[in-house]
């Protein structure tokens, strides 16, 4: 009604998914991944097991993919770096934090059995074995009591100080500023490695935002100029708007290279590596 071109730029799978019982769609997400997006192989994971690079190298780049090795390495860290907490993790909140579906994804725990029926991931044998391993690590003093009660701000500060030798991180993108701040202060950094893994050969099934998206946007009935708002939606969803919100302004933050692809300008790349908060702004 207000901008027919909108229907040409929206992702039809996402648009239809948002339709209500009356068949109409009233909102659209700012970030949505469809089945085709996942199958393209271009969707980065957002959950990682990370370790301080200096610790990793000092210990000879150890393997922590099995329960036995994991427990042994945590003890080695405790003995070699008594000032650090061997393992930390993103905030638990009201649930189990990264120790529920995130850990299950690392272990490749299926959602359904071979017959297509519901599979209770919480009772998976390998998952329970890893939970016991984490409990043993905790009882050995290699996971702090504070990790279960720290709020987001407290956890962030500990990451900036490099207090944790290793971490199970749910939502790595949200830690970019903290990782950069630590790197600036310390001369080392956190790196992602293969963490807890399946002992039976299952591949990890790390997840990302699905078709429902992240934040949903709506045009209210009280909008004074719904046509203008719809046109803004169209622009932001279309390629020019996507480039603007991702890369900024041509000649100011990015330029096209000889292959016709977008490259950040050198000063922007440097800002990303040295001041993540300023880069995000």
Which residues does each PLM region occupy?
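Extracytoplasmic/secretory soluble proteins
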Residues: 1-281
